[in-house]
A protein has these predicted regions:
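Cys-dependent protein tyrosine phosphatase-like superfamily
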Residues: 1-99, 110-155
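Substrate/cofactor-recognition hotspot
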Residues: 105
């Protein structure tokens, strides 16, 4: 079963049939992601730290037949423009199997929660279950989330 294979990926969390999330996968794990039928990878991590990135992640992902979208989000300073780029990427690949990752699934879980509330109309408690099961946002992230929810009418 795909979930058994994918469960070895750091902080892997299946969201539903169309979305999987995790921390940074290895090259071999990206092959498992492709084999599980995912067609798009959205990366919210940076490429400047070898502990949390692959040397040629775009090439690796594309060589496996998946689309690759990179939205580098500074963990210490998430930006509204990053969130809006994420919304655009999610909507552009709607109906596909999407794998979203960052270094530890923290950025992803926060952005996905915001996406679910702001763009899909979910209630906040349900939308942020993934995030709350992984981590408790620090002051910077809590403020960012609250600001985005307030700005887009869900605060």
């Amino acid at each position: 079963m795909a979930d058994d294979t994918l469960s070895g990926i750091y902080n892997y969390r299946p969201v539903d049939q169309a979305i999987g999330t995790s921390g940074q996968p290895s090259v071999a794990q990206f092959a498992e992601v492709a084999a599980a039928g995912f067609t798009t990878v959205i990366n919210l991590a940076l490429h400047d730290d070898p502990r949390y990135s692959l040397p040629d992640e775009p090439g690796t992902v594309q060589s496996l037949g998946m689309d690759y979208v990179h939205i580098p989000v500074q963990f210490a300073a998430p930006m509204e423009a990053d969130l809006l780029a994420f919304f655009t990427a999610m909507q552009a690949h709607e109906g596909e199997k999407i794998w979203v990752h960052c270094a530890a699934n923290m950025r992803v879980s926060a952005f996905l929660g915001l996406y679910r509330v702001i763009r899909q109309g979910w209630d906040k408690e349900r939308a942020f279950e993934l995030m709350n099961g992984l981590w408790q946002p620090n002051e910077r992230w809590s403020s960012f989330i609250a600001t985005m929810l307030a700005k887009y009418g869900q605060g």
